[in-house]
């Protein structure tokens, strides 16, 4: 086990890990029912160092920013390590964003190098504005033979001659720029340091140790803060094995558990719900006799493990279920969005512990995590080691804004000192989430103070980022809010977006307006669609630079309108 407190950078820690566990398997890449590749730590190192040398031959230098745009695959992790080895700054981008959104973030991050999958590169080159932000060097993976790469290099051919120069970095140096939100509005690039990552990793593995022989199933995109930490850094720094699955099809996820004897996996609530549905469907297809027996065994397991998990007992009582998950599954981690307590309880009753947590990119991923001592599905656990957590201005029920102080909290927002000063005050990160801290140390979330929603898939949606999609509607002016921001409620489920439609006093809205809004909605992914609109007859309050004062407008709406009667559903 490496002593991460003694390391100055991720590059240095990963370099030693690759040497210490050289013959252990570090990475398996699987796609549906076939295995694409398998790397030991030695082979992974042998693949990354020629790439690092090639980058340096192209002019890559210390602190150069490099964006990665790829689906889950081994080349993502190999590229990330090469960047850290060369002393660079990683910019992980979401491959599911539109090409226009990706270009906006590439421009904002000032990335000088880009490593990208071929189908994404083809779309990016066709997007308006591409010529204005093309990086100095582009490496394209998985390009077909003879494909026009537009001056880019083939990743597979980037094998420099000789050994690359290892570039040391310090704990306070930038390690990555991670975008915590969208794209159409004000980009929020979280600058995370090497210390942020090293301390976060130390905290997590103190509760759930990775080690050689542990097998972690990675299904979330590696650009996702959760998977980057527990699907790459955590396992690699401890000699464990990561299984990258390049599909989200439920049947292939289920098959991967027994095939690779998975120990841990991280999921977002949406994936957990899909797994629950699959299991309930299977249980429903059993004969009445077997269904009754199963209910009895589940009930017995629930009683015997009501205080804390007992894997040996659960695997004995519910052997068939645990064998379906490979027989070695210890825990599922769930985060990124609100998880229904009933779903967590469902898995716990089967003897499959689900450790839910709470975090945000600005805090280096995780802030709290359930240690399952005892199992508390109604909370998001206790603060991780090294994390201070307080409730700011609590009300009579003890509910207030959750604020965090830790070595894992980001350095700042990229090129946005105003937003940084509003978000980090006297060393405390203002999360914008409401919660209550119990005497036991468990955190209960109770809603949001900020104008945003989090989808079941773990995506942060900031309403102002969506307004461009509704430009041109027949309104004097409009803006979009999270309904729970306009009318705060003690809930994190059923979050919705509402469009505020500014009309002239007494003006009636024609039937064409909701039709137009519905048409615009259909062009958006489901998780970005507005659920309704409301009419507002007063001018929007604005700053001297004509920006909408959203907090003041929200307060005005809150005082004058009732949600149940004001919102017209689409």
Predicted regions and their residues:
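ANL superfamily adenylate-forming
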Residues: 33, 122-171, 279-320, 537
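Conserved AMP-binding/adenylate-forming
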Residues: 265, 309, 313-443, 449-452, ...
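AMP-binding/adenylate-forming catalytic core of the ANL superfamily
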Residues: 97, 114, 406, 411-412, ...
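Conserved AMP-binding/adenylation subdomain of ANL enzymes
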Residues: 198-215, 222-315
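Conserved C-terminal "lid"/linker of ANL adenylate-forming enzymes
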Residues: 481-482, 498-499, 518-570
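Structural core segment of the AMP-binding/adenylate-forming
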Residues: 58, 85-157, 495, 505, ...
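Conserved pre-ATP/AMP-binding loop-to-beta segment of ANL
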Residues: 22-25, 160-179, 186, 209-215
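Conserved AMP-binding/adenylate-forming core of the ANL superfamily
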Residues: 6, 23-73, 77-81, 98-103, ...
């Amino acid at each position: 086990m490496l002593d991460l407190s003694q390391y100055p950078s991720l590059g240095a820690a990963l370099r030693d890990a690759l040497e210490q566990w050289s013959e252990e398997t570090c990475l398996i890449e699987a796609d549906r029912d076939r295995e694409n590749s398998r790397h030991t730590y030695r082979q992974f190192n042998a693949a990354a160092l020629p790439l690092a040398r090639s980058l340096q031959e192209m002019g890559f230098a210390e602190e150069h920013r490099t964006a990665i745009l790829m689906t889950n695959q081994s080349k993502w992790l190999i590229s990330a390590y090469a960047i850290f080895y060369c002393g660079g700054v990683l910019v992980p981008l979401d491959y599911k964003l539109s090409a226009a959104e990706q270009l906006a973030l590439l421009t904002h991050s000032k990335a000088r190098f880009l490593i990208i999958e071929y189908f994404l590169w083809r779309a990016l080159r066709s997007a308006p504005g591409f010529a204005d932000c093309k990086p100095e060097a582009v490496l394209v993976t998985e390009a077909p033979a003879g494909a026009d790469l537009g001056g880019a290099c083939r990743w597979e051919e980037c094998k420099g001659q000789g050994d690359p120069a290892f570039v040391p970095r310090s704990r306070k140096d930038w390690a990555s720029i991670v975008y915590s939100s969208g794209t159409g509005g004000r980009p929020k690039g979280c600058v995370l340091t090497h210390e942020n990552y090293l301390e976060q990793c130390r905290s997590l593995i103190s509760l759930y140790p990775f080690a050689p022989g542990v097998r972690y199933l990675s299904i979330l995109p590696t650009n996702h803060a959760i998977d980057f930490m527990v699907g790459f850094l955590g396992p690699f720094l401890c000699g464990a094995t990561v299984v990258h699955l390049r599909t989200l099809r439920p049947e292939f996820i289920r098959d991967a558990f027994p095939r690779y004897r998975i120990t841990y996996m991280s999921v977002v609530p949406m994936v957990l719900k899909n797994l629950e549905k699959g299991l309930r469907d299977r249980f429903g297809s059993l004969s009445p006799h077997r269904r009754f027996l199963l209910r009895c065994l589940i009930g017995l397991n629930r009683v015997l493990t009501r205080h804390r998990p007992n894997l040996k007992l659960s695997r004995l009582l519910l052997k068939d279920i645990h064998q379906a998950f490979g027989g070695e599954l210890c825990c599922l981690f769930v985060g990124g969005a609100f998880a229904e307590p009933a779903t967590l309880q469902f898995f716990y009753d089967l003897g499959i512990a689900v450790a839910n947590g709470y975090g945000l990119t600005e805090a280096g991923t995780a802030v709290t995590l359930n240690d399952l001592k005892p199992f508390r599905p109604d909370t998001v656990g206790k603060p991780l080691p090294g994390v201070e957590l307080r409730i700011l201005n609590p009300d009579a029920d003890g509910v207030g804004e959750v604020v965090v102080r830790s070595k894992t909290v980001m350095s700042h927002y990229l090129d946005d000192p105003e937003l940084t000063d509003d978000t980090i005050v006297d060393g405390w990160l203002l999360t914008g989430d409401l919660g209550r801290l119990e005497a036991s140390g468990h955190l209960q979330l109770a809603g949001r103070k900020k104008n945003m929603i989090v989808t079941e898939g773990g995506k942060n949606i900031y309403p102002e980022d969506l307004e461009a999609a509704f430009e041109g509607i027949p309104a004097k002016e409009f803006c979009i809010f999270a309904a729970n921001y306009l009318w705060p409620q003690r809930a994190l489920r059923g979050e919705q977006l509402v469009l505020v439609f500014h009309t002239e006093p007494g003006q009636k809205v024609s039937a064409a307006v909701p039709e137009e809004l519905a048409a615009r909605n259909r062009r958006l992914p489901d998780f970005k669609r507005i659920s309704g609109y409301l009419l507002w007859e007063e001018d929007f309050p604005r700053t001297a630079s004509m920006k909408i004062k959203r907090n003041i407008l929200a307060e005005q709406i809150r005082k004058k309108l009732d949600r149940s009667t004001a919102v017209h559903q689409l």
